[in-house]
Amino acid sequence: MGEYLTLPMEVYSGILVTHEGVFHGDLIVEEMAFEESRVEKDDFVISPTFFNAHTHLGDAALREAPRLDLVSIVGPGGYKHRMLSQIDSKTLRQEVELEVRISRDAGTSHFLDFREGGKAGLEIVKGIDGVLPLARPTSVEEAEEVEAFGFAYSSARDHDLKLMEEVREIARRRKMLFAIHAGEKDCADVDAALALEPDFVVHMNSCPEKIREFVEAEIPIVSCIRSNAFFGLLNKKSYELLSEYEKWMLGTDNAMISTASMLDEMHFAAYLIGKEKAILRAATASYAVFGFRHGYVVFNRNCSFRRTSDPLLTLVRRAGVKDIERVLIL
């Protein structure tokens, strides 16, 4: 008896779940568009794909990191840099590709990846679908020449301020992003970060009193909540403030600590701070902030969504790869 091949559907009828509401209609695969309907349809649950606004994907070669403090793990000369220096570039690339494939299968389409290691570090992720590399130049000359989506630095306390100011200007001239970490451990590096007028800043968990200044300047802020938890730096007050900000985004930070899947990040965030609607917005806001179009994730109703009273809550709190029928990425 022959085997039967089930071809993917070209239309998925159901509900589209976004932070703006729930809509009945049809997802037309060929057009990558959702068409609303006046008729209630609920065969599938559909959501936008997710955008990971902060990763260090090369760290995937170091699964799992030991329980040390922030500086000992990721600071200059710390565990991460010592261990990565012992791994060849081919292995690093293979681990990045694996982490990206796993996360894309879970609905995360794009990754803003903070790259270390100069041009060699950029080569590790070159050509990997969905990875948007942000370089960390160590000289003005390197910043002028490097081909990347933008530039990104760790804490202002780790780098020469004059160099970062010059790279910031180069980013403007070359129409590239400029990003920086700030407020992860304390407030000491926040004013310097703010003065650089970055296109977005990562963390701010330990400095809630300065969040308003970034909001008033309309500078997007990325939270990496599982990473904060790992380092003992959770601050619910900061996340609650950020949940009210339309330019709040989510990332996953170091792949040696957390998976790069935004489903996993949303699950953790939901149980820590609630505000599931804001969390879903933060997992998809980066498309608009950085000028990309989202795709769609089609979930079946066989498991998590089977008898749900609220599909948005199920999506943010518990939906997993077992529930995914198809991921459509532009």
Curated annotation (Swiss-Prot):
MF (Gene Ontology)? hydrolase activity; metal ion binding
Q: What InterPro entries does the database record attribute to this sequence? A: Metal_Hydrolase
EC number(s) reported in the record: 3.-.-.-
Q: Which residues bind Zn(2+)?
A: H54, H56, H181, D253
Which Gene3D superfamilies does its entry note? Metal-dependent hydrolases
Q: Does the keyword Metal-binding apply?
A: yes
Q: Which UniProt keywords apply?
A: Hydrolase, Metal-binding, Zinc
Q: Which family does it belong to?
A: Belongs to the metallo-dependent hydrolases superfamily. ATZ/TRZ family.
* Protein name per Swiss-Prot or TrEMBL: Putative aminohydrolase AF_1775
